């Protein structure tokens, strides 16, 4: 597990700027950011931290960005995406800061259709969000073959699981988001993420309603994955 560590802006901004500039034809770097939830911070300060971070991202020349509301390291019960009204407030403030740049919101798995529809209405419905990427890792208790805690250390009995094990949940979220998009008649992009380890997985996400597909774990273990997927599209 590696969490979401961040260095000072003086370090990550130049690095992000170089990465954006290095993207070749047909490539796009999507910067992802999130606000920090500090103990004692009130609602206004939490919103303001997202706005400040989004501004720092714009300074790198980013043409669009993703706001992460689903960091598993904050604990399942503290995930920002489980509070659609707060997400709505934050995205409206962020959108006012970043202007015409498209804003994507990264979602965890949300099992309830009503909650998911409220999320769409509170964000896309207010013109603040142009797309969703989903899903993030799924928090689970990890044990070894003997039933003992798999990851050493206090407080690490649960961790965010990624890869092949979560593909079904990712496809489910994409399909339900696609249905809500059609039901409400709203225009927003869906980026499918989770368990994409072979070309067939890309196809499954597209058929479920995703406009684009991302791979993290799959691409880490198979550097040729994107090339293999592209070959099937010819």
Task: List the model feature ranges, each with a label.
Residues 1-127:
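Active-site entrance/lid segments in N-terminal catalytic domains of soluble metabolic enzymes
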Residues 6-10, 47, 167-171, 199, ...:
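Electropositive phosphate-/nucleotide-binding environments in soluble metabolic enzymes
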Residues 32-36, 107-110, 187-200:
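Glycine-rich beta-to-alpha transition loops that act as phosphate-gripper elements at the mouths
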Residues 45-48, 111-126, 179-183, 196-213:
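Catalytic cores of alpha/beta
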Residues 69, 128-140, 195-229:
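Glycine-rich phosphate-binding active-site loops on the catalytic face of alpha/beta enzymes
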Residues 72-82, 119-120, 124-186, 226-228:
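Glycine/Thr-rich beta-alpha phosphate-binding loop at enzyme active sites
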Residues 79, 83, 108, 162-166, ...:
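Glycine- and other small-residue-rich loops at beta-strand/loop junctions that grip anionic moieties
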